[in-house]
Amino acid sequence: MQTTNSKPFAPVALVQAQQYDPALIDRAVERLLELLNIPGEWFCGKRVLIKPNLLMRRQPQEATTTHPLLIKSLADWLYRAKAAQVIIADSPGGLYTPAALRGIYQTCGMQQAAEQSGAVLNFDVGYRTVSAKDACICREFNLIHPVVQADLILSVGKLKTHC
């Protein structure tokens, strides 16, 4: 696994969509990638991991997890950019088993997003320990297989507020 210390072109970009409408989300994704100055050529022929926030088994309307329309739109964009494969993977809270992942993907809408976009859902629950010898405190990390095996990783969080 290779990492890079290069600085992003734009550290943060926010794009508003007034509702979860597929056309609005598609336009928002296009604009977001444009603001971040991310060229489609980066993804050509690559195995790309989309890492949503799938904290727990919740319906999209509960606004706990990354919305599946956003993941579908991003996967569609990646395939238009000629990504070789798009994988949806996370290590949610609770049990990390194929059965638990199946339930979370179904409830959170990721199964439908994958079916509609052609993305692949991860059911590999293995991990690899990687070293970070120059780290100050934690020098080893357990990373799930799809993270280690991906050429590129796009982390797509869920913007939340907590009291």
Could you tell me what each predicted segment is?
Residues 1-163:
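N-terminal and secondary-structure boundary signal
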